[in-house]
């Protein structure tokens, strides 16, 4: 009985100690914050802030800053947060994606960021910018970010560069304040984007690039992977092709969406007829070679791209690196599915027939057309391909994704047994398969 009471006393003492420590920590932090707010208010009352950002940084001691990053410290560890505080990141492009990168980097503990962008905050960009408000419209995007980030973490050094990044001034704009640990590409002009990626690659600087967020709306299709493995991203395809011409085949990590572009969702925004009638349409763009018409952007998507980029950076410098599936490029899986169709052809007595499908068509059929699951059972494991209608040749509109067991039944009853599709499958399955084939016929126009 005495031993039991002793353990109760020890437990109660431990809980009391934890509670007192937590309360003391909270009280100290609150007192520090209140003291600093009062000091700032007094400074304003004297006629505005006269101290430089460097001096202002010293108003906040390290323990106070660490408390503001408490959750990140607990998750990533003290060493990673310390390392992050010493990272120098250059973000090129301060729009929908870039502003979220800067915002989340600052909130995560990065203390030295250079932001390069020539553009101004527009009214139409407020739906996707990380911090811009109505009063910021018409002001440089980089200055907008600096002002708002100062309110969040005044100890962070934001270096705003209100210029267009070009290959000619790349050395100055990228390396002028020292060699960065990371370059983040959030540019939406293709040629400038390619130049920046080549610059980072040739200088051996870690880089991550945002691909196209326009006309995308499915967050479940967001991926991180090498540029060489992207799918269903027209911007990535063009950038990849241009970099190949410059001898860069891989080694550029990107954030991209594998969602198939669908004109039914979003189309290139038209230019008003009156602008065409005035002539010299190219002069309407902000700069030579920059876009005049644009694809519409769902406001939530750029933020996902930006936050993913920051998460990649955090993971890269920690002991918790990302292990992404390279988009949907599960080559071995798709090759196995492809071989399942070749094996079926041998089993039904036509081994010499060349399958008119490429390996890339397999990922397209599995992921895009049949949504990664069998139309019969809805199961998404042990998938194969099977010829559907025995009276028609194999094509993208006569191949169905089935499980291995379903493939065997289909072979025995339809392909070998000569039973009709209507006798083997109910109307619901037949309707769904027909719907998938119609969707493929539509999608194939844009492949």
Swiss-Prot record:
Phenotypic consequence of gene deletion = Displays only the t(6)A but not the ct(6)A modification in tRNAs. Unable to sustain respiratory growth under non-fermenting conditions.
Set out the biological process GO terms recorded for this chain's protein.
cyclic threonylcarbamoyladenosine biosynthetic process
Q: State the species of origin.
A: Saccharomyces cerevisiae (strain ATCC 204508 / S288c) (Baker's yeast)
What remark does the entry add? Present with 1170 molecules/cell in log phase SD medium. ct(6)A is involved in promoting decoding efficiency. It is an unstable modification that can be easily hydrolyzed and converted to t(6)A during nucleoside preparation by conventional methods.
Q: What gene does the UniProt entry assign to this protein?
A: TCD2
- What is this protein identified as? tRNA threonylcarbamoyladenosine dehydratase 2
A GO MF annotation of the entry reads: ubiquitin-like modifier activating enzyme activity
Location relative to the cell: Mitochondrion outer membrane
Its domain of life reads Eukaryota
- What EC number(s) does this enzyme carry? 6.1.-.-
